[in-house]
């Protein structure tokens, strides 16, 4: 709609509702680029236009976070399909990455000042996004200066040590024995 005021209003309402229920974080907005009509998450994404995503995400995030609730921008990055989403390789070149897939996330970090960000399930350049050094360290923390919290999508981490070393702060597990399994030696010594 390009209506930034309505986006800010929506963010305020979401933030108020979350705060009223005692919630500290909203797992939104989802700002991936809509690339295929078959993507099962299109209903939660904003647009196929990276500029529109950037323009609408910033006031939405600000509206949420003005209510003392953190917005968790997701799914970083290149999460544009549901088929084989846990292991699909997103094969895009650097230009497409920078011009199409990252502008919304960059705006969310630099202008929206989002406090949290969620990694994606898919792979990029051979590494899962939830522990991808290039995305998390080089771009997100290095270039953009993000100092907030990065969490994984549920079950999105395939190497806990690599995730911790590459900048993931919180791993969301799908198993009930996560602590016993993943925090066994030698990882426990590093935490």
Locate predicted features.
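Glycoside hydrolase catalytic-domain context in secreted enzymes
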Residues: 1-191
């Amino acid at each position: 709609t390009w209506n930034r005021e309505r986006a800010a209003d929506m963010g305020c309402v979401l933030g108020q509702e979350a705060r009223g229920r005692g919630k500290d974080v909203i797992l939104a907005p989802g700002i991936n680029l809509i690339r295929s009509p078959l993507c099962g998450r299109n209903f939660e994404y904003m647009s196929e236009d990276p500029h529109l995503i950037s323009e609408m995400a910033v006031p939405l995030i600000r509206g949420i976070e003005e209510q003392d609730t953190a917005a968790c921008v997701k799914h970083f990055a290149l999460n544009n399909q549901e088929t084989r989403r846990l292991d699909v390789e997103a094969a895009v070149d650097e230009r497409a990455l920078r011009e199409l897939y990252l502008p919304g996330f960059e705006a969310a970090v630099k202008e929206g000042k989002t406090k949290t960000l969620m990694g994606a399930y898919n792979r990029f350049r051979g590494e899962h996004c939830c522990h991808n050094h290039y995305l998390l360290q080089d771009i997100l923390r290095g270039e953009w200066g993000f100092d907030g919290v990065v969490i994984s999508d549920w079950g999105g981490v395939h190497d806990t040590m690599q995730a911790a070393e590459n900048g993931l702060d919180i791993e969301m597990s799908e198993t009930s024995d996560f602590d016993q399994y993943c925090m066994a030696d030698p990882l426990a010594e590093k935490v």
